[in-house]
């Protein structure tokens, strides 16, 4: 069967977001098409009231069933492909953040059904799922030459329904998602969402292709340049430094907040569906068991994230702080737009759920404490308070919150493998990786064979000294690798 690509939308897929994909389409004249007829449906984000007339027949279908959780269409369970987008809307509402709601399918469903407003929203999401399945089924019937479907994220109803039907028809599905650097992205063959579940979580081994030699130095420099060049498109770049309000010598812990309805939280089973409830518990544990002061950094993207459009996490954490005794209030700083790099320079530890900002914390030498699970858990450079109760006590050993050189080496190896094996740089020169991936479903989108052509950005000596001061772990690591490679090459051959 000849190759023909179907892009699920042109909302996410355009040249600015995925330049090498479009270069590959142009360079190799790859047959492709975009579904463009349902823009208002793509952007519903779990709110389908404005489409109720278009959904009339699907709503009637839903109303014929008593158990909304068990409805199927074309052998696809509607609740399974609707849950994530339903929560994308539900988690913008206050009553979902009271705490005690596990992020587990049955618990979420039962909580939604107990509230009339949520029940109606769920009913419409199920109707949308039914409608999308019928739409895609008819679309694919009319385009039997489609060999590959390419979707963004995989958590929206319109993408989940397409993925389910593509699986039935043996159509290969590639899921794309941005990495936190803003300059790299994932592109993986999969039949489920990619949020907080990229391939390296399931299929990863250290030193898989790069050995302790000059190539290792090049890979390290490449990973370093990608991290230094990061520009998270969801975080406004503001040069605002945090001013330390505490005059004591108590340790400072940074909690990195995420967008309340972020799919990386929604798609990860946990004890709490509400990130806000998890943050509150983390703050309570720090106040109760340590002398640490706490900086909570809310995510500025909440003001622009649909359908939230307000700083919900910041509002709820502020309300929580105001409910505490004054002596505890004085130990907490709530911020939003301040540079996270300026906070890394003064804090003694970092906590978070699954934010990829925790990887940036590792880059600065911290060993983050995870409140939840993430694709980089259990790799040797993060930790859990549940697994290490000595983390939270009055004596507070700062060394436990920092990476040892061996742990930093594991982080460096992980990031090298991420950038050279799992991620595609959003650059023209990476178009060949796209073609390689399309032609071989077992191939990893690997930049390793391009390492010889990579040139890291030039740095002024003042920039270099500043970076050594900020991140001594990284430079000790790179120096060690370079020295090893030189010693190895200087040994006489036998």
Please identify what each model-predicted range represents.
Residues 229-318:
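Conserved catalytic-core segment of nucleotide-activated headgroup transferases in glycan assembly
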Residues 4, 22-130, 178-231, 452, ...:
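Conserved N-terminal ligand/cofactor-binding loop architecture of enzyme catalytic domains
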Residues 8-18, 151, 263-266:
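A short, glycine/small-residue-rich beta-strand->loop->alpha-helix junction that serves as a flexible
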Residues 313-335:
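Nucleotide-activated donor-binding/catalytic signature segment of Leloir-type glycosyltransferases, i.e.
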Residues 134-193, 371:
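Conserved nucleotide-sugar donor-interacting segment of glycosyltransferase catalytic cores
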Residues 158, 335-382:
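A donor-sugar binding/catalytic signature common to diverse glycosyltransferases
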Residues 195-240, 380-493:
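Leloir-type glycosyltransferase catalytic cores
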Residues 2-12, 35-39, 150, 258:
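Nucleotide-activated donor-dependent transferases that construct or modify glycoconjugates
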């Amino acid at each position: 069967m000849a190759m023909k690509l179907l892009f699920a939308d042109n909302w996410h897929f355009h040249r600015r977001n995925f330049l090498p994909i479009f270069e590959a389409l142009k360079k190799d004249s790859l047959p492709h098409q975009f579904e463009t007829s349902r823009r208002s449906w793509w952007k519903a984000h779990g709110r389908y009231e404005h489409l109720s007339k278009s959904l009339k027949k699907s709503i009637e279908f839903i109303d014929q069933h008593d158990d909304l959780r068990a409805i199927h269409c074309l052998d696809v369970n509607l609740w399974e492909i609707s849950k994530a987008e339903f929560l994308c809307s539900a988690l913008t509402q206050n009553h979902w953040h009271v705490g005690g709601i596990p992020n587990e399918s049955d618990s979420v469903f039962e909580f939604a059904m107990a509230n009339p407003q949520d029940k109606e929203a769920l009913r419409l999401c199920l109707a949308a799922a039914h409608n999308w399945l019928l739409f895609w089924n008819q679309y694919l019937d009319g385009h039997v030459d489609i060999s590959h479907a390419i979707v963004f994220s995989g958590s929206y109803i319109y993408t989940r329904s397409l993925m389910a039907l593509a699986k039935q028809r043996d159509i290969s599905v590639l899921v794309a998602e941005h990495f936190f650097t803003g300059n790299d992205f994932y592109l993986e063959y999969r039949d489920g969402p990619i949020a907080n579940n990229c391939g390296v979580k399931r299929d990863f081994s250290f030193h898989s292709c790069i050995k302790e030699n000059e190539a290792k130095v090049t890979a390290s420099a490449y990973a370093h340049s990608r991290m230094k060049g990061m520009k998270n498109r969801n975080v406004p770049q503001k040069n605002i430094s945090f001013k330390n309000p505490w005059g004591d010598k108590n340790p400072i812990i940074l909690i990195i907040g995420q967008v309340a309805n972020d799919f990386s939280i929604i798609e990860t089973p946990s004890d709490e569906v509400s990130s806000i409830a998890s943050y509150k518990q983390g703050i309570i544990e720090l106040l109760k068991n340590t002398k640490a002061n706490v900086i909570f950094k809310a995510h500025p993207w909440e003001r622009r994230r649909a359908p939230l459009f307000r700083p919900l996490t910041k509002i709820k954490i502020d309300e929580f702080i105001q409910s505490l005794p004054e002596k505890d209030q004085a130990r907490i700083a709530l911020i939003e737009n301040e540079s996270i790099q300026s906070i890394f320079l003064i804090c003694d530890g970092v906590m978070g759920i699954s934010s990829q900002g925790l990887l940036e914390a590792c880059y600065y030498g911290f060993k983050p404490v995870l409140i939840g699970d993430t694709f980089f858990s259990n790799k040797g450079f993060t930790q859990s308070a549940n697994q290490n109760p000595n983390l939270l006590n009055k004596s507070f050993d700062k060394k436990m919150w920092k990476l040892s050189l061996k742990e930093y080496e594991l982080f460096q190896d992980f990031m090298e493998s991420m950038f050279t094996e799992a991620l595609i740089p959003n650059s023209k020169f990476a178009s060949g990786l796209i073609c390689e991936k399309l032609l071989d479903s077992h191939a990893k989108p690997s930049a390793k064979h391009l390492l010889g052509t990579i040139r890291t950005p030039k740095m002024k000596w003042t920039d270099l000294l500043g970076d050594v001061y900020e991140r001594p772990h990284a430079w000790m690591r790179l120096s060690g690798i370079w020295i090893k490679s030189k010693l190895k090459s200087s040994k006489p051959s036998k």
